[in-house]
Regions:
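Terminal peptide-recognition signature
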Residues: 12, 16, 30-31, 49, ...
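Conserved CoA-thioester-binding segment of acyl-CoA-metabolizing enzymes
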Residues: 1-50, 87
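Crotonase-fold acyl-CoA enzyme core
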Residues: 90-126, 130-219, 223
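Amphipathic alpha-helical segments at domain termini/boundaries
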Residues: 1-11, 15, 161-258, 266-286
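Acidic-histidine catalytic/liganding microenvironments
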Residues: 41, 92-93, 262, 275
């Protein structure tokens, strides 16, 4: 992690280039420390969060960290702990702009959604995804709750259940990001942040209450994805929509723990660790 101050703005950069800035426990711990300091520092008016390099903002969570989980209770507790870092950014008391300098998968998108606003490098064909179902589990750092509240239930329903990526252009269309940037992304983020601080730009925050759910949600082609994981994912999304964001996040953590009791989470993680991210896991739907 790198932090530098530019006047009254903190620039926070996640730096793990060999793994496309994937988040491990050390990154979570440093994010907690850095953003706690930012919140307490009266001289800092806001923050920009970005990633090192040009290929990825954050490529997701370190899967080895998840493979070490032994029980549903342990998985739920880990989820709750990780969420506390994401919630810290959301509840910073100061605006934060995410400069999404490359793909934002899994926990990368979840960190971005906790920020006040999001900007992306222009023209990214593969930009944002919640690929967790490909590994046999649901998102665990807020996506099942924040994504529907940010882009609408129909868009989130398809993104979450299909696990397919969307482009930066599509992300702007559905309201996941504020804009695509052709030039210097961090400078554009600083400029937007200054406007938010000055009150000349207003960003609508993610709703904290229940959200409406259409009686007919889009059909989603699951392909070879686990039907067991999908049923748990639907449960987290739909139950969370009926309640507050805070309660929905607790539901997500609990359901993430339930994933650990399935055969398909073990199959998905084993396949990823042995064969890599492009391998299709032989799920048994249990």
């Amino acid at each position: 992690m790198i932090r530098e101050n530019k006047g009254d703005i903190a620039i926070v950069k996640i730096r793990r280039p060999k793994v496309l800035n994937a988040i491990n426990q050390d990154v979570f711990d440093q994010l907690r420390e850095i953003f706690t300091d930012i919140r307490k520092d009266p001289n800092i008016k806001g923050a920009v969060l970005t990633g090192f390099g040009t290929r990825a903002f954050v490529s997701g969570a370190d899967i080895g960290m998840l493979a070490a989980l032994k029980t549903p209770a342990e998985a739920e507790a880990k989820c709750t702990e990780d969420k506390s870092v994401v919630n810290l950014i959301e509840d910073l008391g100061k605006p934060a702009v995410c400069a999404m300098n490359g793909l934002a998968f899994g926990g990368g998108n979840e960190l971005a959604m906790a920020c006040t606003a999001r900007l992306a490098t222009q023209g990214q064909k593969v930009f944002v995804a919640q690929p967790e179902p490909r590994l046999g589990f649901i998102p665990g750092a807020g996506a099942t709750q924040r994504l529907p509240r940010l882009v609408g239930m129909e868009n989130a329903w398809t993104m979450l259940r299909s696990a397919n990526p969307i482009s930066s252009t599509r992300a702007k269309e559905i309201g996941l990001i504020q804009d695509e940037v052709k030039g210097d992304l961090v400078e554009a983020a600083i400029d937007l942040l200054k406007k938010i601080i000055a009150g000349s730009v207003s960003i609508t925050p993610i709703p904290k209450g229940p959200i409406p759910v259409s009686s007919k949600l889009p059909e989603v082609d699951l392909g070879s994805l686990s039907r067991k994981t999908d049923s748990l994912l639907q449960k987290a999304i739909l139950e969370g929509a009926k309640t507050t964001l805070a309660e929905g996040l607790k539901i997500e953590s609990k359901v993430f723990g339930e994933c650990l009791a399935t055969e398909d989470m073990k199959i998905g993680i084993d396949t990823f660790l042995k064969e890599g991210p492009k391998a299709s896991a032989p799920f048994v739907h249990k």
